[in-house]
């Protein structure tokens, strides 16, 4: 999660409060508040822009209690989204993954269940119309493999927003090796910088939305949208 060209940390806890650590100068400040802070039997934390409005959401996947979803607004303000029955109040959530599975530019959320009982997989996506309100950046290293650990920064007239490739992947969380950005209202003049794991940075100008851009360390190509 980052909306200021600086990476932040989201931490979920069973016995202590959930936290959002935002770096300010040389220290981190916890900006979590309200319902977000309440401890839960959390198994997975995922940050992604599920509805392509240009503001990321934080998904909290719990086991044996309802899942929660929060939108990150300006200045770190958190707005809880009512998931209703899709909160899976009796779900035995274990892991989750986020990816554009059907390649329509809208992210899907796959949730796995089990551990204390048999439950099926569930697959969700936002109920929004397909459009060109997204930009997807897929960095590849010199060998053509996903550039895990590379940091992509989108700059526009409204924001600087950094995402590190596969930063959220781990034991129970998985994400595709793509930086997915929804587009805000009135947003334009898009530029992208890619900082590779060797410390070097390449800069690119984005002329069209609704596409997936594939960056290589020496050049750039555009894949079909």
Regions found by a protein language model. Name each.
Residues 1-4, 42-52, 94-103, 123-125:
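Beta-propeller blade termini
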Residues 4, 20-23, 47, 57-58, ...:
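Carboxylate-rich, polar loop motifs that coordinate divalent cations or form catalytic acidic clusters
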Residues 8-13, 57-62, 109-113, 192:
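Hydrophobic beta-strand segments that make up the repeating blades of beta-propeller
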Residues 14-15, 63-64, 147, 186-187:
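Short proline/glycine-enriched turn/loop motifs at strand-loop junctions of beta-rich domains
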Residues 16, 41, 65, 92:
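Beta-rich catalytic cores
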Residues 16-31, 66-81, 117-132:
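Beta-propeller blade repeat segments, especially FG-GAP/WD-type strand-to-loop junctions
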Residues 38-39, 89:
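Conserved loop/turn at the beginning of each blade in beta-propeller domains
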Residues 77-225:
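Gly/Ser/Thr/Pro-enriched helix-cap/hinge segments flanking short amphipathic alpha-helices
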């Amino acid at each position: 999660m980052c909306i200021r060209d600086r990476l932040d940390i989201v931490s979920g806890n069973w016995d202590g409060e959930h936290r959002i650590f935002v770096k300010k100068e040389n220290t981190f400040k916890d900006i979590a508040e309200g319902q977000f802070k309440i401890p839960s039997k959390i198994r997975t934390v995922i940050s992604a822009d599920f509805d392509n409005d240009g503001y990321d959401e934080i998904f909290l996947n719990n086991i044996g209690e309802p899942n929660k979803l929060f939108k990150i607004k300006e200045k770190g303000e958190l707005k809880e989204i009512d998931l209703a029955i899709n909160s899976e109040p009796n779900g035995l959530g274990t892991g989750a993954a986020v990816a554009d599975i059907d390649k329509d530019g809208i992210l899907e959320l796959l949730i796995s269940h089990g551990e204390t009982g048999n439950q099926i997989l569930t697959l969700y996506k936002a109920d929004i119309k397909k459009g060109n309100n997204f930009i997807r950046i897929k960095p590849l290293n010199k060998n053509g493999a996903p550039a895990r650990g590379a940091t992509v920064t989108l700059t526009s007239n409204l924001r600087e927003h950094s995402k590190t490739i596969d930063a959220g992947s781990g034991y129970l969380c998985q994400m595709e090796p793509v930086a997915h950005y929804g587009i805000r209202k009135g947003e334009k003049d898009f530029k992208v910088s890619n900082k590779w794991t060797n410390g070097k940075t390449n800069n690119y100008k984005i002329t069209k939305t609704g596409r997936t851009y594939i960056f290589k360390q020496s050049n750039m190509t555009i894949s079909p949208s």
